[in-house]
């Protein structure tokens, strides 16, 4: 199928908001976690497809700051699913030369998640075929507030602040 696609028209970066897994499962009379588990399979297929088409950057908005308002049991199950998925997929990321990055308020995640994500990011940091970015505990508001706090922390003057400088403080900047 990739033969018939004009590679000049393939974007370098694709961002996907992962939404609706729970609702999809409910419509089928299944549990929300059934939907989330199927979402993991969809992520695997999406990553494989992105690699096949030569996408350089794939960002998955996987868990927003709003998701913390869900029932604790669902959050705990999602965090366990995150840990097991990262554990299961790290070797595949390495084998396929895919780098994992994470953006968002990672310190809000359970320590077990932070540890597993850190391990995977360390093991894949030199991979160059594609960068897979997971946005976890992330929102646009969080992104802006985080950048502003870091600018203040670095004691930047009003004269120094420009669009270019501000961009350097965003977690979504290219790296």
How should these model regions be labeled?
Residues 1-175:
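Flexible, compositionally biased loop and terminal segments
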């Amino acid at each position: 199928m990739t033969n018939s696609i004009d590679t000049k028209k393939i974007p370098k970066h694709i961002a996907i908001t992962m939404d609706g897994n729970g609702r999809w499962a409910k419509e089928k009379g299944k549990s929300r976690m059934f939907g989330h588990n199927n979402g993991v399979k969809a992520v695997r297929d999406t990553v494989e497809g992105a690699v096949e088409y030569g996408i350089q950057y794939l960002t998955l908005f996987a868990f927003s700051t709003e998701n913390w308002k869900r029932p604790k049991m669902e959050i705990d199950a999602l965090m366990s699913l995150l840990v097991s998925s990262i554990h299961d997929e790290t070797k595949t990321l390495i084998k396929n030369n895919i780098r994992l990055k994470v953006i968002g308020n990672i310190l809000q995640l359970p320590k077990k998640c932070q540890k597993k994500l850190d391990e995977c990011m360390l093991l894949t940091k030199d991979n160059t075929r594609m960068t897979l970015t997971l946005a976890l505990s992330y929102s646009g508001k969080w992104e802006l507030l985080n950048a502003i706090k870091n600018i203040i922390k670095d004691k930047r003057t009003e004269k120094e602040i420009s669009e270019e400088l501000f961009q350097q403080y965003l977690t979504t900047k290219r790296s």
